[in-house]
């Protein structure tokens, strides 16, 4: 054939599709524009017939510029900018054994002589003011000084956690508003809840994960509502950059410790006899009647066997003046026909009433001896009333109604308890529904929840989650740091044995107490009781913290091993840029009078960067380049700087809450209502008729001078408020205001 020598049609060689590719750079440098591919137009070839000629002249085509979805707003830089890195180390968490239910940041500045320090979870709040205070404590260093540079740009932070040898940790951070805390913040940080969170950072110990890096690095961008522009450092010094939450956990043995064979815990609650005798002010009755009424309930006449509540190893030592006698067995023994003596404490017999079946003393005589012991013990307290507050006879340490003879668990027979109830709690049966916890004042006489008197109710969550950090948050919520000695905790839980729940009255609460309180010891199990406590021995939060800690630790993923301390160390690095328009200063000193050192160029004092408090940075505190007029400072600048008064920080003792601790979040509308209520109380804007009527009701005998001074103070208060409002308005017009949700 004629075409036999032709080769057969073969496939085209495969080649990669053309792409722009990625710009590979070995060293970071300024990015360049990607090359634009030339657009190729292919001519269409007609398969049939001759191509037709165009009958008109085609115009030039233009590409219309696409409309941008957003524009970039540029801001002119100040005359001088300095990049600054703030680097330092700090403990992210320190927890002594027995303080796991507490918040570490709330107890960061505690002065503890003896006992556990810190807490099992931490809620940090970082700001520029906090970093400045850490620098004053020599905990960090700044690569650039902010002196005379009042502007700032924030770029973010980097945190590096160093893994602990034997403790795991769970870390979360928050950069979305609102950046404050609420009553559910601490319960959400329980390890059982933290493990269920979506954005968590696990920091395993070296035992849990022997291999891998020894550090965990986290990059945290600026807050979501934070606009990237120049701010005055004075305006953002107390701005929350981010919140950091840390909690200690156990990822190796999350449910049961290898040191025990049981997940249940046991604690004690007050018996029903105390329900109407909980008030420390004794109610409306006098002290003698109050004691008699309680003893009649504890030792009724018609129930002689009920006096076995005194069958403890502490009764004879406490009720000793006069001595409360018990049955003494004869030396001859019980006899041939008996194995035990007739009154035997091992069988729950009332050993303080009967002796060989004969009643030696009545319940009335026992009540009189106990009351006499209270009076004799209280007499010594009255003698020392110059150095201590008296308290009351009913609340004496060794003889009161909450003394060891009534509440001590060291009994002859545990089946016959005192005025308490042993409760067993299993966290795996707790579904949360029906659980309640709240706080009652020590002046409240009963154990029933009352919305008008009880505070901080939490309900329908597992008990070990609700109690986590509950006391520390109550101090923030009430702004009362002495709350631990002024309130008591009550709870209801239908998942215990026996059930701490009354079907007919769900508001019926139970008062738990620690084992050391029942034994007459301090919360740290110290047998010595201070003098100021000997007339005020009643259950409050300090005597309940041990029970709260045990319930919280019983939950999943909590560290249950007995360790003296658990700690997590971290290193942080914040990225800022300082800016401003400082004046050029040139200080010339006589070179002949300069000091000398052993080595030229060196010294025994290390050089440090001078850091200025951001609160005192601004145009009102220093001179700027625009203040110079003909090489001299202008009169307005001199007046502006001279009006600022220097206040020493040592004049004030400081706040009771550390600045780095997470504060309570106050909604804007609630904050406005509080301010309005305060303004209404101060009465700066009331009408003349209202002010005159209130003035007549408050004081009619006041002099004209006092009224004028009061009006002058109100005018000063009004002036300060208007000045603050005007400053905020000016910041808003200048565009340097901060989002209120970030403050």
UniProtKB/Swiss-Prot annotation:
Subcellular localization, as worded in the UniProt entry: Virion
Presence of the UniProt keyword Chloroplast in the record: no
InterPro entries membership: TTvirus_Unk
GO cellular component, as recorded: T=1 icosahedral viral capsid
Residue numbers spanned by region Disordered: 665-706
Swiss-Prot/TrEMBL keywords: Capsid protein, T=1 icosahedral capsid protein, Virion
Pfam family, one: TT_ORF1
Function as written in the Swiss-Prot or TrEMBL entry: Self assemble to form an icosahedral capsid.
Similarity-based family: Belongs to the anelloviridae capsid protein family.
Protein name (database record): Capsid protein
């Amino acid at each position: 054939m004629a075409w036999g020598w032709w080769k057969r049609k073969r496939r085209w060689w495969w080649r990669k599709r053309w792409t722009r590719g990625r710009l590979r750079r070995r060293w970071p440098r300024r990015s360049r524009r990607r090359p634009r591919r030339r657009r190729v137009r292919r001519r269409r070839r007609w398969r049939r017939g001759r191509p037709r000629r165009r009958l008109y002249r085609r115009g030039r085509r233009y590409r219309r510029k696409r409309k941008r979805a957003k524009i970039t707003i540029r801001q002119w830089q100040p005359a001088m900018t300095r990049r600054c890195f703030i680097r330092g180390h700090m403990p992210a968490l320190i927890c002594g054994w027995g303080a796991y239910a507490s918040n570490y940041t709330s107890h960061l500045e505690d002065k503890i002589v003896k006992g556990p320090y810190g807490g099992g979870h931490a809620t940090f709040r970082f700001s520029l003011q906090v970093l400045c205070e850490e620098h004053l404590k020599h905990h960090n260093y700044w690569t650039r000084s902010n002196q005379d540079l009042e502007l700032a740009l924030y770029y973010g932070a980097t945190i590096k956690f160093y893994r602990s040898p034997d403790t795991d940790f769970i870390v979360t951070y928050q950069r979305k508003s609102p950046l404050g805390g609420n009553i559910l913040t601490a319960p959400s940080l329980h390890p059982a809840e933290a493990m269920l969170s979506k954005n968590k950072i696990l920091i395993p110990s070296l035992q849990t994960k022997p291999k891998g890096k020894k550090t965990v690095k986290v990059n945290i961008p600026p807050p979501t509502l934070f606009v990237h522009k120049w701010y005055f450092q004075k305006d953002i010094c107390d701005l929350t950059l981010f919140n950091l939450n840390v909690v200690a956990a156990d990822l190796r043995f999350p449910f049961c410790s290898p040191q025990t064979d049981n997940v249940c815990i046991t604690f004690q609650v007050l018996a029903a006899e105390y329900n109407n005798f909980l008030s420390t002010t004794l109610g409306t009755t006098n002290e003698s009647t109050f004691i008699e009424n309680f003893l009649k309930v504890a030792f009724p006449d018609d129930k002689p066997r009920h006096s076995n509540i005194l069958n403890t190893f502490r009764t004879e030592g406490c009720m000793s003046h006069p001595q409360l006698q018990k049955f003494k067995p004869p030396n001859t023994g019980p006899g041939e026909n008996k194995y035990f003596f007739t009154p035997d404490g091992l069988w729950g017999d009332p050993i303080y009433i009967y002796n060989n079946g004969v009643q030696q003393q009545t319940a009335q005589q026992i009540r009189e001896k106990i009351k006499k012991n209270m009076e004799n013990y209280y007499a010594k307290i009255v003698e020392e009333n110059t150095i201590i507050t008296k308290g009351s006879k009913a609340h004496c340490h060794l003889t009161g109604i909450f003394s060891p003879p009534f509440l001590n668990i060291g009994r002859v027979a545990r089946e016959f308890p005192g005025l308490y109830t042993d409760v067993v709690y299993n966290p795996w049966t707790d579904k949360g529904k029906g659980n309640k916890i709240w706080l009652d004042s020590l002046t409240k006489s009963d154990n029933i929840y009352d919305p008008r008197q009880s505070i901080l109710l939490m309900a329908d969550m597992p008990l070990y989650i609700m109690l986590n950090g509950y006391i520390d948050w109550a101090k923030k919520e009430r702004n009362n740091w002495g709350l631990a000695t002024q309130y008591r905790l009550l709870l209801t839980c239908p998942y215990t044995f026996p059930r701490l729940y009354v079907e007919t009255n769900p508001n019926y609460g139970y008062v738990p107490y620690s084992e050391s309180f029942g034994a007459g010891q301090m919360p740290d199990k110290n047998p010595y009781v201070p003098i100021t406590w000997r007339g005020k021995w009643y259950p409050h939060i300090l005597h309940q913290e041990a029970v709260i800690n045990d319930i919280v630790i019983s939950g999943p993923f909590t560290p249950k091993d007995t360790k003296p301390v658990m700690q997590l160390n971290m290193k942080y690095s914040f990225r800022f840029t300082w800016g401003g328009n400082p004046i050029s200063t040139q200080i010339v000193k006589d070179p002949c009078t300069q000091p000398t050192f052993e080595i030229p160029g060196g010294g025994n004092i290390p050089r440090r960067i001078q850091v200025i408090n951001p609160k005192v940075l601004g145009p009102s505190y220093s001179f700027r380049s625009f203040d110079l007029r003909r090489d001299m400072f202008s009169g307005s600048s001199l007046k502006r700087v001279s009006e600022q008064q220097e206040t020493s920080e040592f004049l004030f003792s400081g706040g009771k809450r550390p600045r780095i601790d997470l504060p309570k979040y106050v909604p804007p509308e609630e904050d406005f209502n509080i301010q309005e209520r305060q303004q209404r109380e101060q009465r700066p804007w009331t009408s003349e008729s209202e002010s005159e009527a209130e003035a007549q009701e408050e004081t009619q005998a006041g002099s004209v001078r006092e009224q004028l001074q009061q009006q002058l103070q109100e005018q000063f208060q009004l002036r300060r408020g208007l000045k603050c409002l005007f400053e905020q308005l000016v910041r808003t017009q200048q565009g340097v205001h901060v989002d209120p949700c970030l403050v």
